[in-house]
A protein has these predicted regions:
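Structural element of the ATP-grasp superfamily
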Residues: 16-17, 241
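Conserved PLP-enzyme active-site core in the AAT-like
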Residues: 4-6, 32-232, 236-237, 242-245, ...
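A glycine-/small-polar-enriched, mobile loop at the entrance of the PLP active site in fold-type I
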Residues: 1-11, 26
Length: 255
């Protein structure tokens, strides 16, 4: 039940840390979905009177209740975490001027949503994310930058963690699970951030030491092995279908 000394689990987390070029990783079936992973990462690294700011506009609908944009029991707002937001410019770029203006002493975490989600704005490239992280770190190097990497894994040859993100967060039932992982999520990042995330996911003092894999660890490894091929096929299919329908006069994304 405890899952102590699970070599398969611990090795998988080393593999994720190696792939994402981070100090540590938390990859668990106990993380039920992407929203759960994001909620864990945020609540682990924010304290009362700290401020969270999203600089890619309003996040996914499901995160609104996590943050407290929409009132919800147990939200970050209920625990005294402040929230601010900077929308993207009309052309889809980051609003550097507004971001600089809103970097206040109480700002602890900056969130970036890589995917367009349910909006029609452009998805953010790793290059663009890297530029804004560099800009932020030059102003205040202690700010934690968390990137919601859902739907973005293995789409490019590098990940947000390669360009300065302190945490990258996602779901195994999306890209990195390769269509095989039945549940799970991951958080990759600095040793300090991941330790806090592990204590939040399980309990203080236990952290990464507990968490049985319940016999599904094989699907996590196999899914990760297949993930780049599955993602490439999905991208090719999307581009092909978009061009097919564009040829018949439909407005499409990607165009």
């Amino acid at each position: 039940g405890y899952g102590y000394n699970d070599l398969g689990r611990d090795t998988l987390e080393k593999v994720y840390a190696d792939i994402f070029h981070t100090e540590d990783a938390l990859v668990r079936p106990q993380i039920t979905c992407g929203t759960h992973a994001l909620g864990t990462a945020l609540s682990a690294n924010l304290r009362p009177n700290d401020k969270l700011m999203y600089i890619s506009g309003k996040p996914y609908d499901t995160l609104e209740e996590v943050i407290g944009i929409r009132e919800s029991v147990g939200s970050l707002a209920e625990y005294g975490v402040l929230y601010d937001q900077v929308d993207l410019l009309e052309n889809g770029d980051f609003d550097f001027e507004k971001i600089k203006e809103k970097i206040t002493p109480d700002l602890k975490v900056i969130g970036i949503q890589r995917s367009k989600g349910y909006a029609t704005r452009p998805t953010l490239s790793v290059e663009k994310i890297g530029e804004v992280i560099k800009f932020i770190k030059e102003i205040r190097s202690d700010i934690i930058v968390m990137v919601d990497n859902c739907y973005g894994e293995f789409v490019e040859t590098i990940e947000p963690s390669d360009v300065g993100a302190d945490m990258v967060v996602g779901s195994l039932i999306k890209n990195p699970g390769g269509g095989l992982a039945p549940i799970g999520g991951y958080i990759c990042g600095t040793k300090e951030c991941i330790e806090k995330c592990a204590y939040r996911l399980t309990t203080p003092g236990l952290g990464k030491e507990v968490g049985a894999n319940l016999g599904i660890m094989g699907t996590f490894y196999q899914g990760l092995f297949l993930a780049p091929t599955v993602v490439a096929s999905a991208l090719k299919g999307a581009i092909f279908a978009a061009n097919l329908f564009a040829g018949h006069g439909f407005k499409v994304i990607p165009d």
